């Protein structure tokens, strides 16, 4: 058997196969109702939606900003990767920050950092390369909230399970993934439409008005979206000290009693 055949054999045989009994399967309609009843879960999804809307929407048009507004082709690749580079550097300290101030406050801090830095880039001397490096490095600090969305979603699911005895992890994460893709698609289209509304088209001469539209789409609009994403975080209320510890203790105790009852 060749290496390729072994690879596919391992891939096929090592897949986890879970068979869900018909009586244990929930209805999609009921699952959606449960999600709509879970305020904190909805807030987490909206936060992730706006975060992806601003971040990935900007990525789709940022290259035009560096080409036509900054007008420096030498550093385009670095500028495009700056957020990821800074995010990789600060990732080791992220858990300590989250542990100290909590997921919600870390997410709010991240949105503020990203929103403020992009608006400063919008109004500032963006043709100055040193200025761009500093602002984009600050913008990259927004990566401190990387795991916060998933953590808050799990907390919301656990809290709902504790209160109502029902959890729908699968549907919640499926909707979250879909919402992220929808946000990316809408943002990409919307920001390009804004550029087109200011007269941008391939091969046209760059006028100050067109550059203004590119700057608006690449910096101001994503910055505003990040600020809007703070609103659902202000409504989210599962970050009270010790609250989730109590929730998990009750869930663990309930599951323990359930297992003991089943073993009898």
Spell out what each predicted region is.
Residues 4, 193-224:
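A membrane-interface helix-boundary motif in multi-pass transporters
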Residues 4-63, 67-73, 214-217, 222-264:
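Intracellular loop-helix junctions on the cytosolic face of multi-pass helical membrane proteins
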Residues 166-198:
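A late C-terminal transmembrane helix in Major Facilitator Superfamily
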């Amino acid at each position: 058997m060749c290496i390729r055949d072994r690879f596919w054999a391992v891939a096929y045989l090592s897949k986890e196969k879970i068979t869900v009994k018909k009586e244990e399967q929930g209805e999609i309609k009921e699952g959606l109702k449960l999600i709509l009843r879970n305020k904190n879960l909805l807030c987490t999804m909206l936060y992730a939606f706006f975060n992806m809307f601003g971040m990935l929407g900007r990525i789709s048009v940022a290259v035009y900003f560096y080409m036509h507004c900054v007008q420096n082709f030498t550093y385009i690749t670095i500028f495009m990767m700056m957020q990821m580079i800074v995010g990789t550097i600060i990732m080791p300290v992220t858990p300590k920050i989250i542990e100290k101030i909590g997921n919600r406050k870390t997410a709010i801090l991240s949105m503020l950092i990203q929103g403020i830095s992009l608006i400063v880039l919008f109004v500032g001397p963006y043709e100055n390369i040193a200025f761009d490096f500093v602002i984009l490095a600050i913008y990259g600090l927004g990566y401190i909230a990387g795991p916060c969305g998933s953590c808050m979603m799990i907390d919301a699911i656990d809290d709902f399970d504790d209160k109502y005895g029902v959890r729908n992890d699968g549907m919640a994460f499926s909707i979250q993934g879909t919402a992220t893709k929808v946000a990316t698609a809408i943002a990409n289209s919307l920001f390009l439409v804004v550029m087109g509304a200011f007269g941008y088209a391939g091969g046209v001469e760059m006028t100050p008005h067109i550059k203004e539209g590119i700057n608006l789409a690449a910096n101001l609009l994503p910055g505003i979206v990040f600020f809007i994403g703070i609103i659902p975080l202000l409504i989210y209320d599962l970050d009270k000290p010790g609250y989730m510890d109590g929730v998990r203790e009750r869930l663990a105790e309930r599951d323990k009693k359930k297992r003991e009852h089943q073993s009898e």
